[in-house]
A protein has these predicted regions:
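N-terminal module detector in large eukaryotic regulators
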Residues: 1-292
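Low-complexity, Pro/Ser/Thr/Gly/Ala-rich intrinsically disordered linkers and tails that serve as
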Residues: 288-290, 294-341
Length: 341
């Protein structure tokens, strides 16, 4: 079971007196520490300022470890541009799951982003804020067997590159993928995680669309957009693994490094007969169309129109909350802000 929180711009937030960018839905009983930590991750930076930005800007999928005064949190986040809010201004929606160890099934974190219904993809104007009465049940499927990394073959020329990325789990080496508009970074991470041993898949923390807002969290694999500030910063730090999909070197150069070459050979293996079929993701394959002019500040990948999903849980209006047990901590009031962080 996992706590869930949704953050977007709305005329009325979950707590009395909140509006603008605020929490509009949360699992009843979440502590202030958890709420504050998730809201601190809810910022979003656009690549394109267009009338249809929600379909062109990247969707940020993240698996993060976040330190708080009361311990470390494991967080899955889906953050995306959204249609204009109730006031006509730009908007985005952030949907979070805070997981415990019992929810770390063998398929790994990326698998959950392909599971329908776990993350909110829109919050219609006028929809009232809600408390989810109980935590979200996480599907506990059998672990994925290593599969052939066909998407890596398609975009990098050799599935072995997935092994280069996977090798960083052993060394804890920071890995940065510099990607153009057309590459689906979530699919790259999904395949690389699949070749890891089942007990190592949750060691892969990642952000498909990394920005400096995430600098104080555990995030080992980072997708950054071409020519972004984050790309320049990554190259300035010695020891980082930087995979620039515009200029990948010959993969044969890794033959002199047995530790990495072993993973390259694993990634080149044919698909296992036991490997599950890849589900249809919440975000279809990115369009290869020529992107529109960018705004002055640039950022990362994974663009596409998302399939909307409305909240599925019937819950009471926060104006008349259901009585809680004394041991339950109610979701606290948050400061009213219009700033999109």
């Amino acid at each position: 079971m996992a706590n869930k929180l949704v953050y977007t711009s709305a005329p009325k937030g979950l707590m009395p007196g909140t509006f603008g960018f605020c929490t509009v839905a949360a699992t009843r009983g979440m502590t202030k520490t958890v709420v504050d930590a998730l809201e601190g991750l809810a910022g979003y930076r656009r690549v394109y300022e267009t009338t249809d930005g929600a379909s062109l800007n990247p969707v940020a999928f993240s698996h993060l470890l976040v330190d708080t005064p009361r311990g470390r949190l494991r967080v899955l986040a889906r953050i995306a541009d959204a249609l204009p809010d109730y006031s006509g201004r730009t908007n985005h929606i952030a949907s979070f799951l805070q997981l415990g160890d019992a929810e770390t099934h063998e398929s790994g974190p990326a698998e959950l982003f392909y599971t329908p219904g776990l993350f909110e993809t829109q919050w219609p104007n006028g929809q009232p804020p809600i408390f989810y009465p109980s935590p979200v049940e996480i599907p506990m499927e059998e672990g994925a067997c290593p599969r052939s990394c066909e998407y890596w073959r398609a975009v990098a020329g050799d599935p072995g590159w997935a092994g280069v990325l996977a090798s960083t789990i052993e060394t804890r080496r920071l890995a940065i993928l510099v990607v153009p508009h057309s590459i689906d970074v979530l699919k790259l991470f999904y395949e690389a995680i699949a070749i890891l041993p089942a007990n190592k898949r949750w060691d892969a923390t990642f952000a498909t669309y990394y920005t400096n807002a995430l600098r104080n969290v555990d995030c080992l694999w980072r997708g950054v957009v071409v020519d972004s500030p984050e790309e320049a910063q990554a190259r300035a730090i010695a020891g980082n693994l930087v995979l620039d999909f515009r200029t990948l070197p010959s993969i044969e150069s890794f033959k002199t490094n047995p530790a990495i070459w072993r993973w390259i050979e694993i990634a080149r293996e044919p698909i296992s007969k036991l490997a599950p079929t890849l589900k249809t993701p919440l975000v279809p394959a990115p369009s290869l169309q020529t992107p529109p002019p960018r705004v002055s500040v640039q950022v990362p990948p994974s663009c596409a129109t998302v399939v909307p999903s409305a909240a599925q849980v019937s819950v009471p209006d926060p104006a008349t909350p259901t009585p809680q047990k004394e041991s339950t901590v109610a979701v606290p009031a948050m400061k009213t802000q219009r700033n999109s962080q």
